[in-house]
Regions:
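Bacterial N-terminal signal peptides that target proteins for export
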Residues: 1-9
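Ser/Thr-rich, Pro/Gly/Ala-heavy low-complexity intrinsically disordered linkers and tails
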Residues: 9-54
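C-terminal functional module detector
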Residues: 53-76, 80, 84, 88-93, ...
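A metal-dependent hydrolase metal-coordination microenvironment
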Residues: 56-262, 275-278, 287-292, 296, ...
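Short, compositionally biased low-complexity segments
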Residues: 177, 265-271, 327-336
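Hydrophobic transmembrane alpha-helix bundles
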Residues: 252-265, 407-416
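Long, structured stretches of catalytic cores involved in phosphate-ester chemistry, encompassing
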Residues: 268-286, 300, 349
Length: 496
């Protein structure tokens, strides 16, 4: 269960003091600074704001995923994996049900958010304490206008139709010790108990979930041993989870160099309506790469275990109830869904089967859209016979593979903002590390590049960004404008 971060503000100050203070009074100074920031800016800041030209509004909604760019006849679809609605006991500030029924305001926040962020699908991952008590279609919480998705006479999902006609697919699943996504039905009982079935943590449990129609993922890989992952042999593993950044008990496991205390102090500044800070950029303070998870991901692929990676929103709307300067809580469903997502590449109709197949095959990449929407990214291998091999596939070195890549550009560059610095990289898995094998700057990468891998191994593409275009929206937090990942692509495995 996640702890409410507002209650952690004293802890935030203490952690920031412990790790960065130069004097015994640093905690008091930090608290005073934050209080002053929340109350009013100083005169110098006022003058700077007054003198600055008006900035174009930072977009709070996202464009259709197709704007990221079709590749080789496949269309990107924006997918959230690992999200909690009213059938998780800890969602909605711990009140998913009110007076015997679902927390309707919280549910409506969720439904509104999936439309505002132009999602194409959400794979719900509810906790056993509630999902085991209801029929699986109940988890969808369908409302008038929703369309059921039927398979074999059973409801296995639903379409939510947005006001502008866009549709979002909702698919049930669970997160406990294992994370089955895309369940068609409840798993078979264990000892006559559905709760025990949902809490399974062994290969037999993995098999029961697969028989119920799901792909099985391991969530919070930072809390798992590599031996456990090998034994369970899941279909997917998380390589980033925002909860692993903000969870006090796991943040330094997932990201050992991350200063959670300072991050929370910084986030408090986004509450000040006069600060000039754009609240949807609070992610720049909260984010750190989950290096523990990425290390295990490298280990798996270096062993030839081609298990695709996903990013997990782990949205509950229960962690940061503090209202930021836009009048919206810090962890609103909209804000978290806007931060990042998984882009699955689908040829033809987008439906439950095609979404799951793209995830299973690793034909997907993670985009951190908090920094802006990238367009034009592409990564595949081409063998000497001219065949294209997509992310997640295995190719023989004997077939002469060459990587064909194209770096993205910012979809909506806006005057008078500076352009971001972008770099395209290729990494090779070597044990528990991803070692950079090649890189290109943004202009060269955007024109398209080719590179021949020198030896067998697992290779993945990554796009890095220094979001200079966001700098004017972060007065006082310019140090947070730094080199960060924009895209994580799934690997391609080259065998002898």
């Amino acid at each position: 269960m996640r702890r409410n971060l507002l209650a952690l503000c004293p802890l935030a100050l203490a952690l920031a003091c412990t790790e960065t203070a130069a004097t015994p009074d640093a905690a008091t100074d930090a608290s005073s600074d934050v209080t002053n920031d929340l109350a009013k800016p100083d005169a110098a800041a006022d003058a700077m704001v007054d003198a600055a030209p008006p900035l174009p509004p930072w977009p709070h909604e996202l464009p259709p995923a197709r704007e990221l760019g079709e590749v080789r006849g496949m269309t990107p679809r924006r997918v959230i994996v690992h999200a909690h609605s009213v059938h998780s006991h800890d969602a909605c500030d711990g009140n998913p049900y009110v007076d015997g029924g679902p927390n309707e305001p919280c549910l409506q926040d969720f439904r509104r958010a999936i439309c505002q962020t132009r999602l194409d699908a959400v794979f719900l991952t509810e906790h056993a304490e509630r999902i085991a008590l209801v029929e699986l279609p109940t988890v969808l919480q369908m409302r008038p206008g929703d369309e059921p998705i039927m398979e074999g006479g059973a409801v296995v999902g639903s379409w939510v139709r947005c006001a502008d006609g866009h549709r979002v697919m909702i698919i049930p699943g669970a997160e406990n010790e294992l994370m089955p996504i895309g369940l068609r039905r409840h798993p078979d009982l264990v000892g006559g108990d559905l709760g025990r079935a949902y809490h399974a943590d062994d290969p037999a449990g993995v098999q029961r979930f697969r028989e119920a129609g799901a792909l099985v993922a391991i969530a919070h890989v930072e809390q798992s041993t590599i031996e456990r992952v090998r034994t369970l042999s899941p279909d997917l593993v998380e390589i980033y989870n925002i909860h692993a950044n903000i969870g006090p008990n796991i943040a330094n496991i997932a990201s050992p160099d991350f200063n959670l205390g300072q991050a929370l102090v910084d986030v408090l500044r986004f509450r000040n309506t006069e600060s000039g800070l754009e609240p949807d950029l609070a992610f720049v303070s909260l984010f750190a790469e989950n290096t523990n998870d990425l290390g295990k991901f490298a280990q798996l692929w270096s062993e030839g275990r081609a298990i695709p990676g996903i990013a997990a929103s782990d949205a509950h709307q229960n962690a940061i109830p503090a209202v930021l300067s836009d009048g919206e809580r810090g962890d609103s469903y909209r804000r978290v869904f806007r931060f990042f997502s998984n882009e699955v590449l689908v040829a033809g109709e987008f439906n439950r089967a095609s979404a799951l197949e793209a995830l299973r095959r690793g034909r997907s990449y993670v985009v951190f859209e908090a920094y802006g929407t990238p367009t034009g990214f592409s990564f595949h291998a081409q063998t000497r016979d001219g065949m294209a091999h997509e992310m997640g596939e295995t190719v023989r070195m004997a077939d002469g593979p060459e990587f064909v890549l194209r770096g993205p550009t910012l979809l909506l560059p806006r005057e008078p903002l500076a352009q971001p610095r972008v770099e395209l990289r290729v990494y090779r898995a070597e044990g528990e590390r991803w070692v950079m094998a090649q890189r290109w700057d943004g202009a060269a990468a955007a024109a398209g590049v080719r590179w021949t891998p020198p030896s067998p191994g697992a290779y993945r593409a990554e796009v890095r960004i220094t979001p200079e275009h966001a700098r004017p929206y972060l007065p006082g937090l310019e140090a947070r404008v730094r080199d960060v990942p924009w895209i994580y692509a799934n690997p391609i495995l080259i065998t002898p």
